[in-house]
Amino acid sequence: MARGPLAARGLRLLLPLLPLLPLLPLPQVALGFADGSCDPSDQCPPQARWSSLWHVGLILLAVLLLLLCGVTAGCVRFCCLRKQAQAQPHLPPARQPCDVAVIPMDSDSPVHSTVTSYSSVQYPLGMRLPLPFGELDLDSMAPPAYSLYTPEPPPSYDEAVKMAKPREEGPALSQKPSPLLGASGLETTPVPQESGPNTQLPPCSPGAP
C-alpha cells in the first residue's frame, strides 16, 4: 500500500522536467547549422541531420508512455486496496495458539529440592492445614495409592510398617473385654478341671462294679 503514494510523489517531481527532455539535442543541432554551408557531399556532423533524430523522439515517447502506465496502475491499485479496506468489517485479531511445554522433574533436581524446601518452610510438619470441611480422621482414611508418575519416591519399608501399626492396634483394642462386664455381677461358669494322674478319684461303693 505504500508503493502507490511513493510512485505518485516521484511522478510529481518528474513532471516539470518532462517538457525539457526533447530540448536536450537542440544545442547539437544548432551547432551543426551554425556552419551555414553544408553540402551533402561534404562531411557534415550527423547531429545536424533531422533524419538521424527520429529514434531519439521515439525513445522519449516510449519512456513517457511507460511512466504514464506506471502511474495509472499505481493509482488504480491504491484505490482498489483502499476500497477493500473500507468494505471489510473490523474483525478482532485471531488469537495465536499457545504452546505448552512440559518439563519433567527428577527428585534429585535442584528445582524439586527448592519446591520441597519452600513447601516445608511454608507448612511445617507439625502444623495442620486449615480445612474448610472440618477435620479428617486419619485412622479411617485409606492411604493413597502410589502412582508411578508422582515426582516423590514411595515411603520406605519402616515408615510403611509404622503407618500400618496404629491401624492394627485399633481393632485389637476393640476386641478386649470391657471391665464393666465383671463389675455388673454376672456369674462366670466354672471351667471343668481335666483329669490327670494326680487327681483323686472318689471311693467306690462295694456294690458298684
Swiss-Prot record:
Feature: compositional bias, Basic and acidic residues: 159-170
InterPro entries with a match to the protein in the record: TMEM52
CC annotations in GO: membrane
Transmembrane segments: 56-76
Family matches, as Pfam families: TMEM52
Chain spans, region Disordered: 145-209
Keyword tRNA-binding: no
Membrane topology according to the record: Single-pass membrane protein
Keyword presence, Cell inner membrane: no
Compartmental location: Membrane
Highest taxon listed in the record's lineage: Eukaryota
Comp. bias intervals (Polar residues): 186-202
Keywords: Membrane, Signal, Transmembrane, Transmembrane helix
Signal peptide positions (record): 1-32
Protein name listed in UniProt: Transmembrane protein 52
Designated gene of the protein: TMEM52
